[in-house]
Amino acid sequence: LFDQKTIKYIPIHYVLNISPSQEPNYYQHRPVVPINNQQMPYRYYARPVAVRPHAQIPQWQVLPNIYPSTVVRHPYRRPSFIAIPPKKLQDKTVRPNINTIATVEPTLIPTTEPTVNNVVVPEASSEFIITSTPETTTIPVTSPVV
């Protein structure tokens, strides 16, 4: 590991290169990248030149525009100016409302009401035993039709 305090003060474009004879050489550091690399901008670069004999270059024949383009290109709008259009109602065919649900019959829900019966037992005359017997009543409930 290098001492980061000493490397911190060296300018970025100058890097200490150790030569095979272990002597420090101060050269401007250039990464090893091909000259024609498009990602690395250089002051001096070589343009690829195609050398050809003087010959006729075939060109595309211009055809008439018979088939119109199917894709309509809309101009780009910024999101702040885009308004959400309301949903378009499609042509709805009138459908008769047929009630597929059978006629609603009242549902009987049993409710329990505890009743207290005081029964006097001859063995224990001074004590009362409380027994509760549920009494069922039916209430007709109709569910609303959806």
From Swiss-Prot:
Keywords: Glycoprotein, Milk protein, Phosphoprotein, Secreted
Entry's localization field: Secreted
GO cellular component: extracellular space
Gene Ontology biological-process annotations: lactation; protein stabilization
Kinase listed as a keyword: no
InterPro entries: Casein_kappa
Expression sites by tissue: Mammary gland specific. Secreted in milk.
Glycosylation sites: T107, T112, S125, T142
Keyword field contains Phosphoprotein: yes
Source organism per UniProt: Tapirus indicus
List of residues that carry Phosphoserine: S125, S143
Name under which the protein is recorded: Kappa-casein
Function, in words: Kappa-casein stabilizes micelle formation, preventing casein precipitation in milk.
Similarity remark: Belongs to the kappa-casein family.
Residues with site note (Cleavage): S80, F81
